[in-house]
Amino acid sequence: MKEKLAALKIEYRTNPGWCWLLAILFLFPLLPEYVSPFILFAGFIVFKVQWSRERRKAKVGTIGKMMMLFMGYALLSTLWSPTPFSTFSTAALWWGMFLLQVMIYNLARSRDKIDALLQTCTASACVNGVIGTLQICGYTLNRYDCIPDGAVLVTPLYKGLDKFVYTHLPFAISTKTFDSRASGTFSNPNLLATHMVIAYPISIYLFLNAKTKKQKVLCFLANVLISAGLSSTLTRAGCVIALAGWVFMFIVLCRRYWKQMFTIFLPTIAVIVPSILTRYGIIFSSGGNGEAKKSSVAHFNIWESLIDYVLSHTRAFFIGTGFGCEETGNILKYMYNLDKPHAHNFVIEFWVELGVVGIILLGILLIWSAGKLLEINTNNSRKLTLVFCVFTSLVLYLGFGLSDFIFNSPKQLIFLFLLLGLTQSISYCYDKTVITDARTLERAARKEIRNTLNQ
């Protein structure tokens, strides 16, 4: 133990920015919304001081520049936004969270460091999975008078502290909490589900590439905890998307890893499917029964209303109403009599906020990022599993965003920059076929298919 502490001290002296990056990835999802960003800002200052001392310049890469273009346009929308404070503060939040992507791209410049980042992300998700499981089990046992109220782990974990902080802010912040659905350290079950959905494919990558039996067992347990954490949220879309992610990875990796993938699938389906059935009250009666069908109807009403709005307003159609979901909430409330804060769909939300221009900028960014993963020559099983597990995390994250707004808070937004930073680092570390046009993209895609079939 003393030797490990001594090695850690030496590591911090030689590379403090890297140590801060690991701490940020572990702590950011676990701390309150109003604390986590400051951990990131402090870590970035340490990183920048280290880089300046070593006379090195921080790079942002092509993906980083494209993100800066998107965020620059979002900031520019303050000029025509009817809620300029909300627009400016939301854009500023994106610029702040972008610092994580910069840190990952500059600090994770080796394959071992990429694995260390993935292990840290998984460890953080496991903690949230345990908390979420305890919350939902405590609620259920208390509901049937098996344990007293004082023995129930409150959900969200920082519920009391959140209420104190938000009531003392100079501006209003309201959050809707659910006692019958676990939220972990987040303020909402959907936010916890986002964390679990992203970590699920990463835990599979670690399980498939574990070198020892002990590592294999730990990675398997990590996947079980993440699945349990996702199940505890009773989030239908998150559970279904996670299962779809497993199916996709099985199709890609079954030639070499079909036994391991089925080993992972058994506990996954054992805890996730009952969650979906419980939400609809099919196998168990919980406080959230009846809300599921109402929620689906409400989502369709929201989407229909906002599409009607942008099609009826030319300026909103092309350049949007301004970044930030405050104006979206106003439109829904005062024009369509729907008391909802956002679109519950990131594509429609950004269409309302930033118009067709914003959708195009974001679409190019995401397609380019997927292309950078596709460039990598996956000529061995480790690279194949890494590329497709990170790609699956990105797809699941965006897929979940089709039923909920996934950029609603710092702790949810940070996952976008985590995945983009990982994409940049993986692209930097591994051999690739450079994509310059549609022909090279097609050639790279064919190579990926051949590599997949030959594994």
Where are these regions (language model features)?
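Alpha-helical transmembrane segments of multi-pass inner-membrane proteins
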Residues: 24-25, 44, 99, 115-253, ...
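Loop-to-helix entry and N-terminal half of a specific, functionally important transmembrane alpha helix
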Residues: 17-25, 68, 218-224, 373-403, ...
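Transmembrane signal-anchor hairpin modules in multi-pass inner-membrane enzymes, especially those
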Residues: 1-89, 106-119, 151-158, 209-217, ...
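Hydrophobic transmembrane alpha-helices and their immediate junctions
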Residues: 51-55, 207, 211-218, 244-246, ...
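Perimembrane helix-loop-helix junctions
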Residues: 45-55, 100-102, 242-264
